[in-house]
Amino acid sequence: MGKNFLLEIGTEEMPAHFLDPAIKQIYDFSLNYFENQKISFEDIKTWATPRRLVVYIKNLSEKQESQEEEIRGPAAHVGYKNGVWTEVAKRFAEQYGASLEALYIKETPRGKYIFLKRIKEGVNTLEILPDYAVSLLKNIRFPKMMKWGNVDFYFGRPIRWIVALYGSEEVKFEVAGVKSSRYSRPPRFLPQTPIEIKDADSYIDLMKENYVIVDQNERKNEILRHIKEIANSNSLTLSYDEDLLEEVTYLVEYPTALLGQFDSKYLTLPEIVLIVTMEKKQRYFPLRDKEGNLINKFIVIRNGTENYKEVVIQGNEKVLKARLADAEYYYNEDIRCPLEKYSEKLSGIIFQEQLGTIKDKVERVRILVREIANILELSTEEKEILERAVDLYKADLGTLMVSEYPELHGIMGSIYAKISGEREPIPQIIGEYIYPRTLEDQIPKNPLSTVLGIADRVDSLTGYFALDLFPTGSEDPIGLRRISGGLLRLLLETDFKLNLRNLFMKSFEVYKFSDKCPISQIEKGMLFIGQRLRNLLLDKYPNDIVEAVMEVGYDELWKLKRRVDFIREFKEKDPYEKLKRALNRLYRILPKDFSPKEINENLFNSPFEKELYRDYVKINKEISKEILKGNYKVLLGYDFLKEFSDHIESFFDHVLVMSPNEEEKLNRLSLLFAIKSLFWEVLDWSKLN
């Protein structure tokens, strides 16, 4: 039999982005804790609101399972002599209430010892729960931890109350000066009269009666239901970011949706300005008409009931009006000057204290863009377009709008470039180079935008690598994981024949770093990039394929992507298993540090090795050039591979590779090495399952 267990940690308001990671940690910790403690349960639920973190464990067993434990006693030579248990052994048995018949001798790394087994009765769950709760609270990590008062304890926000109930029984403990009890608190918008919770079973319904929907999924569904009702009843359509819904869910405990509006004159502002103002600044849901046009209405989610809703609506409308009036002012002021004028301000904006100004960055990126343009053999016109785009791509950082709305960098630059009369595709490049910013974003449509995006990210990463500003643990204040993820996607999802390591080396050269920033930091940076790349690939492809292609290098990502595409297709072909088996046999026999010699055909005396050499010459002549150019799919239609695989097997079955004749041995190993070198140019076949 079991009882339901409830733990509610009441806090001051937590930032919305703290909560989802926190409840995932709570779930994982709880699962591991009770499994390790051998306490069974039916299910674990974790919930969060701005003011409470909750774990609810259904049907938690009242007692640990009994466990058999093996106890080591004295050394055998002390406790067992001449076939008889000694007094030492008898005392050992008596100490644990066991008979002499229960003793046995067992070999250990330290010699032979006397052992006995006994059944250890499980402890009552109620006695274990205080340790669980305290350990849990000490183990939860937040993006920022804080300490309050004189208490030597860190948490996301100060803990103000704790509810801990096992069935109807209180679980007594103290953390951060707060004692557990059965009393919760209502939401902030109600008088703070404690809510007595009689038992864990009644918690959810009782909190709902007190205007707290504890389950975040239920809150999210309530928000969706309310906003859809408002939109449908007004013949409107919703327009919102999924992240906004997630954030608002964690900002309220009892959601109520209200419809507000703003002056239609603000609809003349760029749509993105209105959306960012409503979604990012105010957490409102924008609305559109049936044709998809943004309109001057919005939905706000209130934390509370519909009481005084007109006052709440008016208050939100007033705040939004002030925001939009500011945005209108910034926009009108900005468009008084051409975008180019704002480039003059970039020498006064710091990119990074040790890496110079934005103006410095622009000039470094210009050199990288030229380098990439030459490698890709772009036309004179394309190079001229890129030069102009580089002139302007950071200019909007000097505008009022982007100073207030940094997330609109690039987007406003594109809008202002059009207003300034810049010819296409320059505005498009300025607006697209920032993408992808997330895993969900598409890469730019214009290849020239991608060129600028690559150069910009390479410059940023090179600077941060040189200064050793790598992320530590979950902390990544600069956003290197995001920047590198964007760079990798740009290179993986295009077929640009670029060498990433060479780009970093060129960028390092452009920076003109002092000796305090050694070039070895680029190697460290490439390792960081490699780990990010591995993670990206593992989200889409099997582990063996990822390891096989990563092992042969990732400097040229266009080749890596082609390797992945090739092996995914080749695995379904007939020659795959035979070739993989033959190549792995070859791989295993080659010494790790083998240095090949020039192959001497005259030293081959077996028909099997002569045949294999002829195969190698044939393959080298017919497809090696294509393989070296990255055209790996040439192997897909190469019918000779099955026969070649048989010849490798025959070679191993009939030829003694490690001949006592040193000259013969080196010649045979050199042939195998040549074959390996050719096929390992494609991938590391030894990594494939």
Swiss-Prot record:
It catalyses: tRNA(Gly) + glycine + ATP = glycyl-tRNA(Gly) + AMP + diphosphate. Keywords: Aminoacyl-tRNA synthetase, ATP-binding, Cytoplasm, Ligase, Nucleotide-binding, Protein biosynthesis. It is found in: Cytoplasm. One of its GO terms (biological process) is glycyl-tRNA aminoacylation. One of its GO terms (molecular function) is arginine-tRNA ligase activity. Its EC number is 6.1.1.14. Coiled coil: none annotated. It comes from the Bacteria. GO terms for cellular component: cytosol. It is an enzyme of class 6 (ligase). The keyword Amino-acid biosynthesis does not apply. HAMAP family: Gly_tRNA_synth_beta. Tetramer of two alpha and two beta subunits. Belongs to the class-II aminoacyl-tRNA synthetase family. This is Glycine--tRNA ligase beta subunit. The gene is glyS.
